[in-house]
UniProtKB/Swiss-Prot annotation:
Taxonomic source organism: Anemonia viridis (Snakelocks anemone)
The UniProt record lists the keyword Coiled coil: no
Pfam families on file: Kunitz_BPTI (PF00014)
Family: Belongs to the venom Kunitz-type family. Sea anemone type 2 potassium channel toxin subfamily.
Domain BPTI/Kunitz inhibitor: 21-71
Signal peptide interval: 1-16
A molecular-function term among this protein's GO annotations: serine-type endopeptidase inhibitor activity
Cysteines joined through disulfide linkages: C21-C71, C30-C54, C46-C67
InterPro entries in alphabetical order: Kunitz_BPTI, Kunitz_BPTI_sf, Prtase_inh_Kunz-CS, TFPI/VKTCI-like
Role summary: Serine protease inhibitor that inhibits both tissue and plasma kallikreins. Has hemolytic activity. Inhibits voltage-gated potassium channels (Kv).
Keywords: Disulfide bond, Ion channel impairing toxin, Nematocyst, Potassium channel impairing toxin, Protease inhibitor, Secreted, Serine protease inhibitor, Signal, Toxin, Voltage-gated potassium channel impairing toxin
Name of protein: U-actitoxin-Avd3o
Subcellular location: Secreted; Nematocyst
GO cellular component: extracellular space; nematocyst
Length: 87
């Protein structure tokens, strides 16, 4: 029974993620430093990075909020204490 519960929990977490969010972080080949966010599938969190401005992929969001909505869906958002403040 415990095995089945674990299976369903893992299946639910991985099934609900948007496929774009599973792409790796790509900084790009240009030299700008635009603050952006990506979904880190290892930590299962949206994290900040500096985007170069060209190249890249769909796992690249202009805000923590946008990343969270795209990768977790329209659920309640809990901002971690160390999350960057949006201005």
């Amino acid at each position: 029974m415990v095995y089945l519960l674990c299976f369903f929990l893992v299946a639910d977490v991985s099934y609900g993620i948007n496929k774009d969010c599973l792409l790796p972080k790509v900084v790009g080949f240009c030299r700008a430093r635009f603050p952006r966010y990506y979904y880190n599938s290892s930590s299962r969190r949206c994290e900040k990075f500096n985007y170069g401005g060209c190249g890249g992929n769909a796992n690249n969001f202009s805000s923590y909020y946008e990343c969270h909505i795209k990768c977790f869906g329209p659920r309640a958002i809990i901002f971690p204490e160390d999350s960057p403040k949006e201005n």
